């Protein structure tokens, strides 16, 4: 079976694991949030890996960097949703800090990837 380039990215693998953990986390949110916060956070966390996958199919490094940047911004969107979940007492402060740490790790790796893509497009 062929492995696509995005599947080899450590940051994509982290985003994949993070998505699963967020899906499991939101299962304990109140049912009235199904079409609100749950839907929003699932969409944003899914977009992290999706942007990396889509960007890997682009030809130029500048285009790849654009999609990596979009993955970065959706990671921050996910952070915002986690802050809302904490504010609404859907998650504890400890849970929030655990997920925030994972987000920081992902954003650091996304920044590094984006910088390498930008540098490769500007020799």
Describe these PLM feature segments.
Residues 1-123:
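Amphipathic alpha-helical assembly/interaction segments
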């Amino acid at each position: 079976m062929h492995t696509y380039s995005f599947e080899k990215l450590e940051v994509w693998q982290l985003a994949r694991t993070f998505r699963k953990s967020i899906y499991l986390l939101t299962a304990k949110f109140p049912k009235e949030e199904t079409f609100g916060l749950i839907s929003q956070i699932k969409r944003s966390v899914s977009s992290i890996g999706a942007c990396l996958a889509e960007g890997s199919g682009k030809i130029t490094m500048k285009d790849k960097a654009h999609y990596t940047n979009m993955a970065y911004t959706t990671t921050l969107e996910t952070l915002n949703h986690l802050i809302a979940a904490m504010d609404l007492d859907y998650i504890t402060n400890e849970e929030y800090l655990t997920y925030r740490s994972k987000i920081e790790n992902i954003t650091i790796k996304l920044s590094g990837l984006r910088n390498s893509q930008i540098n490769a497009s500007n020799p």
